[in-house]
């Protein structure tokens, strides 16, 4: 990953960065995509559909199928179908999906930092 010159005053470069950020967030948008990605990271091995479904509380089959298809289309998840009876289908992160790891960790760290800041501000207001 390269260092960005965040003080860049080139409007074209700023637009390129904004567009890239929007594209990345589009891939991750929705309630379930990040949960699916986190489950696949945590598993450290391919998961069958039923295993994913069991690991994710409150997701229905239709939504899981839809989200997996979108993640597959975006190159984040790969679906492997084994030619056997009964059919066996597994899902795993692609190289592009694995490359999301540091960004996901940075988002998690940022979210915890932000949450802690709000907690501290609430405590100050109570006093």
Ranges and model annotations:
Residues 1-28:
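N-terminal leader segment of winged-helix/HTH proteins
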Residues 2-6, 38, 99-127:
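Amphipathic alpha-helical dimerization/coiled-coil segments
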Residues 15, 23, 46, 53-55, ...:
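Non-catalytic interaction surface on structured domains
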Residues 19-63, 90:
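N-terminal helix-turn-helix DNA-binding core of bacterial DNA-binding proteins
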Residues 49-82, 86:
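Canonical helix-turn-helix DNA-binding module
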Residues 83-107:
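Basic, amphipathic "hinge/linker" alpha-helix immediately C-terminal to the N-terminal HTH DNA-binding motif
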């Amino acid at each position: 990953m390269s260092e960005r010159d965040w003080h860049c005053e080139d409007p074209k470069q700023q637009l390129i960065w904004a567009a890239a950020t929007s594209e990345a967030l589009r891939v991750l948008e929705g309630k379930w995509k990040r949960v699916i990605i986190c489950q696949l990271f945590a598993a450290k091995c391919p998961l069958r559909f039923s295993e994913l479904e069991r690991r994710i509380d409150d997701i229905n089959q239709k939504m899981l199928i839809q989200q997996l298809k979108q993640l597959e289309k975006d190159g984040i998840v790969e679906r492997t179908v084994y030619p056997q009876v009964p059919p066996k289908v597994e899902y795993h992160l692609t190289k592009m999906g694995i490359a999301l790891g540091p960004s996901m960790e940075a988002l998690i760290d940022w979210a915890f930092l932000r949450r802690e800041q709000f907690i501290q501000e609430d405590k100050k207001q109570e006093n």
